[in-house]
Amino acid sequence: MKMVFCDIDGTLYRDNKQISPLNKEALMRFRDAGGKVVYCTGRHILEMGMILEKDGYPFDYLVLNNGGAILDGNKDTLYEKHIEASVGLDILQWGVDANMFVHMCDGKKSYGCFNHQSFAHSDQGDIPIPDDYMTLMKKSPSFQIISLNQENRQTDQIDMIKKRIEEKYGSYVECHPNLHFLDVVPNNCSKGTGVNYLKENTNATTYTIGDSWNDLSMIEAGDHGCTFDYAHDAIQKKADHVYSYVYEMIDDILGGKI
């Protein structure tokens, strides 16, 4: 059995718009030929509605939260880890104090905050709400993922808060930086651990493709690790194959070239 692990942002979508409709068509052809499709992403489940329901991308598994949660084709949970409430609250407070855009998901709800304005968060956008953010956060028993965004698109604050998190909570969480974003997930979670989990439980031949730094563990874990010609040179050097679009990789798989 062959299994494709595909990143979302920068791979299938850019600014929440499909990069090419041919990618979806190719994934459907791959699935029709008996392959399994997995989306391997830093997104949480509440951010996947547009892709799965509205745009109708086919899937058999979901690796979410940079490996923190793995779901089957019915969206039933196969694997899940959480960040302890006390740890998550500290990290969120640091982000709020630094006036970064912060957001979290506890598996059922997702909220963000910037400039002391709270938002209900989804893949359809951010809806302002009147609640005090940290008071709202204390109602969550734990967190699946916490994300921090430096709004000026620089990385100095991201670098500092990453260091602070790792110094105090390095045995509890992992940090996955991606440009001016930082995803914080439970320890021993990455896209690569998601690939390995499904590989061990299905004995599939794995093909992985992504474009950014948080995709490296996935690219390296796959039997055939792939990236794009627009990815950083250091990422391209780690990959077995380099493409312009996902559908090119699918064509090579179905054509027996890889």
Predicted regions and their residues:
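Short hydrophobic/aromatic-enriched beta-strand-loop microsegments
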Residues: 59-65, 80-81, 123, 225-229, ...
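Asp-based phosphoryl-transfer active-site loop
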Residues: 2-17, 219
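Structural recognition of alpha->loop->beta junctions
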Residues: 54-69, 74, 125, 130, ...
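Active-site phosphate-binding/coordination module
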Residues: 18-118
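Conserved acidic, metal-coordinating active-site core of Asp-based
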Residues: 98-101, 105-218
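Mg2+-dependent phosphoryl-transfer enzymes with acidic/Ser/Thr/Gly-rich catalytic loops
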Residues: 1-2, 20, 181-258
